[in-house]
Amino acid sequence: MVQTYRSPVRIYKHPFEIVMAAYEMRFPTCPQIPIFVGSEVTYEYKSVDGAEWVIDRKCQLNVEAPYLVKKIAGVDYVYFSQKNSLDRRKRTLDIEATNISFSSRINVKENCTYYVHAENENWTCFEQSASLDVKNFFGLESAVEKLAVRQYGANLAKGKEILEFFIEELLKKTTHIERFRDADQEETTSATDSAIEMKELSDGDAVLVNDRPPMLAAETDEMRTARATASFDDADSKLEAEYIRRFLGQLSPLEESRLCEIKYSLQAHHKGKLPNDAHLLRFLRARDFDVAKAKDMVHASIIWRKQHNVDKILEEWTRPTVIKQYFPGCWHNSDKAGRPMYILRFGQLDTKGMLRSCGVENLVKLTLSICEDGLQRAAEATRKLGTPISSWSLVVDLDGLSMRHLWRPGVQCLLKIIEIVEANYPETMGQVLVVRAPRVFPVLWTLISPFIDEKTRKKFMVSGGSGGDLKEELRKHIEEKFIPDFLGGSCLTTNCGLGGHVPKSMYLPVEEQEGASSSEDPLHSTYTSTATWRGYPVEVVIPIETAGCVLTWDFDVLKNDCEFSLYFSTEKIEQPAVRDGAQSPTTILNPVEMVSAAIGGASHQHPDLQCAPELKIGTPQLRLEEKAVVFQEGDSMQGSHYCSRAGTYIMQWRVPETAAGHSSTFDFGSHKCRLIYYYEILNSENFRGSVASLESCRSSSFSSIAPPTPPTPGTPRNP
């Protein structure tokens, strides 16, 4: 596999002529570069006017390689050729280097360029690219490739330091070298026109009297700041090393190279706006700096942003009233690392009410607006603090978390949101502090953790404590003056929604869909629509094979009243057949039977279970687990039951006798109740391990909940 490298633009704040003179001081030998043994000139050409100078050198290197590699290769030194082409008129130097040793087995190519900064003619820019292709090296291709990459990366960091050293040495003797001018060129530049004014010393040396900074130098700083804070980059901009250090952070030479590769590749093949450098770096980190994988991720994200008009979401999308009033989340100052901090009181969130009142689309847009806002806040923090801030912190308060938060449509909506964020906002989460985690949290974590990237999971820290102990732990991550009041601090969070139950009057109307349902909408894809008639209940038989499972359910009464009960039987019971997806007498009885059922319904004794009429309450084979509760039209109910025994559980909905008794005998509409329902079994085996691993999180101190990374086979453990 060909290994490539491309450097960002490195800037020397010295004129091109000074940099070139310092560069030549490295030859024929350079003690500052230990592996550089020496060089000899093999070819040299100078133009008559002195504007062009081409020189070829054969250089000798003492490569630091394992003894075995040197022994097999049979050499102590390696040789490469270097061709320097200097054009004083254009003020450029092009360097081409290739290996001589083992050229049939290894191909090494390096190209470097020195040129004048486009916005400041007294600065010099440097760019570098290289490629390595190990074809065949005595069966040690992988080892040689890793060795070469490591050595090359180590020498890159020294390159600028060494040239800066020679520049400083040169400036001790002279501070000005005349530019090349053609013989017939008139001298039109006066001392007052020059950006650098010189003064000659008594010993003949010259010094800088006034280094007048060009106007564009200040503009460059503004442009860099704008580029760091904007969502998208200038398509023609180049990466500069100082800009990377200032706005993106300290990167290794190879990481800088990968950033340059993906940026310039996207610029060459993609028309239109691109994610800014900070966001490109996030994609690279999410894919371990694999340029090909990161590029695929960026392409998919660009398409997704266009399809959903994400670039304008902060300007065009308005939060619905229910979100403004009842969504308990907001931005809240910053953590100790300077990262913007978002607080979400998830335990106070009515997941069902929020989803039923504003829909999946608005909740997704809410998340996207938070992420887009977070990117802007991180960029603003970078500008304000003078240090790179590329992510934000999330504090999740789980006080109030219960089984109702495990409502399947809500969990499915959450998983969809996680999927979108992982794909389009990678590496934006600096840390996640989960506080006041109750015992039900392991169940929720088991459901969502497989969909969270492993790197992100490692950033989750959980605490189950409260009060003063929790406050002390929070002080390790958050300045005391910023700790929220509901977590024991003094900082008010007045811009957060209240949370709590969303009034049913704000619910959107439920559209019943007979037959096929939308797979995109968890409300429609999850629920089953059915009807129960007087004397003909709806019964759902649920076999539980292992004790310790949790049965959860949710239903909405759409028309008339119904009565809900939960039974348990030690007997094996089959689910009754249902025709056309609805368990109603219209598909079972003929009209005469329906009239007879209505007439005799008041006096006829119905069995406790329609699916097993031989079983009676009070016998060892059948018992009532949840007493009958009457729900009226428009009611919504979420519930859960801990299955302490294995056996058969039966959920039953029936028309209550009280409702039927007050209606006309032939008023068939009052004997029918329509509802939608769903249920889910949470198997104890799926979260038993999570419960055990999270027991340590019951204390007030924060603990990581990410599983330990298994050691690579053959890798010794740390003692």
From Swiss-Prot:
UniProt organism field: Caenorhabditis elegans
UniProt name for this protein: CRAL-TRIO domain-containing protein T23G5.2
Chain ranges of the CRAL-TRIO domain: 319-495
Compositional bias ranges of the Pro residues kind: 707-719
Boundaries of every GOLD domain copy: 524-681
Matching SMART domains: CRAL_TRIO_N, SEC14
PROSITE patterns membership: CRAL_TRIO (PS50191), GOLD (PS50866), PRELI_MSF1 (PS50904)
Region (Disordered) location: 700-719
Domain PRELI/MSF1: 2-175
InterPro entries: CRAL-TRIO_dom, CRAL-TRIO_dom_sf, CRAL/TRIO_N_dom, CRAL/TRIO_N_dom_sf, GOLD_dom, GOLD_dom_sf, PRELI/MSF1_dom, SEC14/CRAL-TRIO_domain
GO CC term (a single one): cytoplasm
Family annotation (Gene3D superfamilies): CRAL-TRIO lipid binding domain, GOLD domain
